[in-house]
């Protein structure tokens, strides 16, 4: 266990992919003599200790470098319950030290040309570049601002390479016309409804098309998950392409768990060329949740905040991460996930604020079953002055059974289900009408949250129960203004009251 980082090293240290000069190897050995015992250093090649309250973020099993995942808890890491959530510890210490705003800087992904190497030489080189005497005089100055500026002048160029240049500022979209129908409706002030259609486990698209056609008239956009629970299904990209062919508005989900920086940039360029204009960036469930044999889980190439940063710059600056110009840049509406119940509300609000600064234009939250606790999280966002910079779609899900309720309560990270709801589902299960009670609970939650500050719509996660979506939207009074259905396609599924109203 390191002396300063409150958690043991997740994996062994990295080694370079090339042979270093003896001088670099010597400095590397010196670094490991003190950084290993003190912080559990893995030699990532881009030390962030000053920005992360002197706790190494590489202790995180997912290798996240910009904040916690949506399953963060005060008690433990959900990937490995024998360890603390290292990002909860970072936030906790940063708030105690008054260094929390340092966490807002969008930090770069690893440069694998630098991974395994030392940083002392880079720092010494930066000191020489800035002027050794100037740096020394600045560091011993009685002016605190000058000391801080001098210190940052040495460390920032090393921390923020030229190809990244992350900061802690908000970057408004560099366009005015909506990139998608979802963005257009949100900008127009409509209360928007989106949903999910479960990707198939086979190559057959018959049921996929049927479900898309079923929900299409009732919602503005349809999401397709990207390997939910780290379990393979048809890709979100393929499902989104089918949705476009069916005349539906897709939301392409991309999980960083399975996505390299090369794949991310290639995928959004291809998706945009195929008229997919909504992209939701997610960390993704850990491979620890996947069926055996499990895939690699010690590191992700990009975290979700880094994905947002890359996609925003591709769209607004017309450049790839490597600096190449994009002659015809993509146009898309960028979204991210939000977790109102993970960790502590003030920690989560900071995480969400950082996502907005990085490029998130809309949030789809994790499932909400407690509107009162949701209010606490929303109030924290108000304090951070971000509600006018992002649209928030609250995640709701109809509980189909008592078994599903208990599974979500006990096994799904970031989801909180009050005991009162569990008791209602237990009573309904005993009476044989659990699914109906689940629908009524969902309708009650929608009614309680729809008028809260900052709430711009709902996202219905049907979890394979797509046929319930028309009823929920109809009974909640959320039919879109241009609502119309194909009678031949929907006659067996649409609530009778809805058909009469047409």
Give the ranges of each region predicted by the language model.
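Iron-sulfur (Fe-S) cluster-binding modules
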Residues: 1-46, 62, 66, 71-174, ...
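Conserved, mostly hydrophobic/aromatic
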Residues: 69, 196, 222, 271, ...
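Conserved N-terminal beta1-alpha1 strand-loop-helix module at the mouth
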Residues: 153-221
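Active-site pocket-lining/capping segments in soluble small-molecule metabolic enzymes
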Residues: 171-172, 298-327, 337-342, 384-447, ...
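Active-site mouth loops of central-metabolism enzymes
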Residues: 171-173, 192-206, 229, 250-262, ...
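Short, acidic/polar
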Residues: 202-214, 235-236, 262-268, 343-354, ...
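Active-site-adjacent beta->alpha loops and helix N-cap segments on the catalytic face
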Residues: 204-206, 230-241, 260-266, 286-308, ...
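Catalytic cores of alpha/beta
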Residues: 259-272, 346-356, 379, 401-406, ...
